[in-house]
Amino acid sequence: MAKFLVLWHLDQGLLSTEMARAVQHMPEYGEKLQGQKKVTDRYHLVGGHGGCWIYDVDSNEELEMLLAQAPVFNFAHYDVRPLADMTAMPLSE
């Protein structure tokens, strides 16, 4: 399993009725992924239009597929960061 921090924000230049509908479907999409244990945490970014989600996936390809299925995929910019579990790292001597 690999964990990724995914920050996404909406491109306000693409504001439309279609974008508004996509945003309305994000909570349902997030709940579905949390139920499947593919998303461990979801946060709203205060003062902006977007979110911060932590994905726990089997591969880069699975992450790409889940991002592409997000309702806001065509309206958002993504910043994807791989995460490392610092407690799993060996201590240097």
Predicted regions and their residues:
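Conserved, structured core segments of small domains
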Residues: 1-93
